[in-house]
Regions:
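Non-heme di-metal
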Residues: 2-266
Length: 266
């Protein structure tokens, strides 16, 4: 049974052959992240758990949700006169996802952070760049990049977060990750990965559209990888008090990740 008003109502997966290609690309992104991003392998090692990294990761998740909450209504509005059904579906999805930041806030409260402390933290440069990309592409070509980001997050969270939470719970306790677990459970029960995919496939019509999808996906992945590198540098490496160094970390990691993905695709 669906747990929210935003669940997969499509009878079948749209453009399955293209999805197979995208799944393979996302699996490569995940593998490269663990192999090439400094500190990433530690997310799977209980001996390398860092409480500050855990807190900062959850705070950034809340920040991203809050920022996306302002973008999703623009996506729904864009489709209002072009594809009213898609406008309705995306509106419901954005309204549901936009409330999930409080799930993570509950987990942070349990490890000693107050709302005042949470909301005093500014987004990483990588998150600022990501949201700038959403607004830029929305103004110049439409909301596809922002929509693809929704699919990317649903897919990657389903692949990575269960293992990460298993490690985290060894240190903070399962009672203190209930918000993150509830978020995953809702996404799984309402089949958000395939739902968001099917919504996007309503507007993917040609091979050129598919290539643009892959280009957006590659850039979005590079910015999410750079977000992790930036958060790791700020917490585990202790660079959080030096903003000048952190602002160099993000674009450097993004460019490197993007180039690696493009070289591998040739």
């Amino acid at each position: 049974m669906p747990r929210s008003k935003s669940y997969n109502t499509y009878s079948s997966l749209q453009r399955p052959e293209f999805r197979k290609r995208v799944d393979e690309l996302l699996l490569k992104f995940e593998r490269d992240f663990y192999e090439k991003s400094k500190g990433a392998e530690g997310m799977l090692d209980a001996n390398k758990f860092d409480l500050d990294l855990y807190k900062r990761h959850n705070v950034e998740t809340m920040i991203r949700i809050g920022l996306k909450r302002a973008v999703d209504p623009l996506v729904a509005n864009y489709w209002a006169t072009r594809d009213p059904q898609l406008s309705k579906e995306w509106g419901l999805y954005g309204a549901e996802e936009g409330r999930h930041d409080r799930m993570f806030a509950g987990d942070l409260h349990k490890v000693g952070m107050t709302d005042e402390e949470i909301y005093a933290i500014r987004p990483t440069f990588a998150t600022e760049l990501l949201n700038g990309y959403f607004y830029y592409t929305l103004a110049t070509e439409g909301p596809l990049a922002s929509m693809i980001s929704g699919f990317y997050l649903e897919y990657i969270a389903g692949k990575t977060q269960p293992d990460w939470l298993d490690i985290m719970e060894q240190h903070v306790g399962a009672n203190n990750t209930k918000g993150a677990r509830a978020h995953l459970a809702l996404d799984e029960d309402d089949d958000h990965v395939d739902m968001v995919w099917n919504m996007i496939m309503r507007v993917i019509k040609t091979e050129e559209d598919e290539e643009r999808f892959v280009e957006h996906l590659t850039k979005i992945n590079s910015l999410f990888v750079s977000y992790f590198v930036e958060v790791y540098a700020a917490t585990v490496l202790g660079l959080g008090s030096d903003p000048s160094q952190l602002t160099q970390v993000s674009p450097g990691a993004a460019v490197q990740t993007n180039l690696q993905a493009r070289v591998a695709a040739v």
